[in-house]
Amino acid sequence: MNSRINTFIVGAQKAGTTSIYDWLSQHPDIDAPQEIKDYHFFNYDENFNKGIKYLEGFYKKNIHCAVNYMYFGELSAKRIYNYNPDAKIIICLRNPINRAISAYKYFVRILKETNSFSEALQKEINGELKSFLELSNNTYIEHRFYYDQIQTYLKYFSREQIHFVFFEELVDSSKQESLMNDVLSFLNIQTEYHFSFQQLNASGVPKSKLLNYIKHKTIFPKLFKPFLPFSYRRRLSKRIEELNISDKNIEVDVS
């Protein structure tokens, strides 16, 4: 790679970071490797300690995306700044109530949330979440404090280096083209490009509960680790996930 990764897509869970990443990946001037999409590098020590050359090895061009960078703002923002102080930051935001419900549904589906919605909120209020994964995934209330998280990025990057994208516009088909042209303009890339705005990151009830359990709660997927490259395992996992999702919605009691 000729230069450092220069674009980072950050934001709240379920706020459109993956969609922006996938749409940008269609552009011929942008390299957004699918195998490390949503890869926790700057905010997860185990990955960060592999070294920046490990991350850069996936890129021929200069764009990188991962969720939760904004939530772990101080840690990730500082590391991104130390890596590339001239980086451009795209921050994705969403109505915090809708975001919390969507995140809850997702973690129920992948078997990382077993409580009812009200029970999950109470556990967070009581301070019962301790591990990195719990703090990353199951903090439905804490994730809503966008102001503090944004201020952390403004501490390291100028306002001109930050562009905001709102989920409510991202899912509005009448605004998608304009939204992406604004993103391209922010990145100083030619805006006359027609994106394919296919549905991304579909959610729903798994078709096979057994397959879903094997994938998320057993060591079976890890058995392939010594034999299959990381990039292939990521693509295979994503494809299995897509094929096993039905159109039926997960119901949430918010009373």
Regions found by a protein language model. Name each.
Residues M1-F72, R79-C92, P96-K130, F157:
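PAPS-dependent sulfotransferase catalytic core
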Residues V10-Q13, N68-G73, N138-Y146, D172-Q176, ...:
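Aromatic-acidic/polar surface patches that form glycan- and anion
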Residues E46-E56, E113-S196:
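PAPS-dependent sulfotransferase catalytic domain
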Residues K14-Y21, Y44, F107-S116, T139-Y147, ...:
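Phosphate-binding glycine-rich loops and adjacent basic patches that engage nucleotide phosphates
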Residues G16, D38, N47, G51, ...:
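Alpha-helical structural motif
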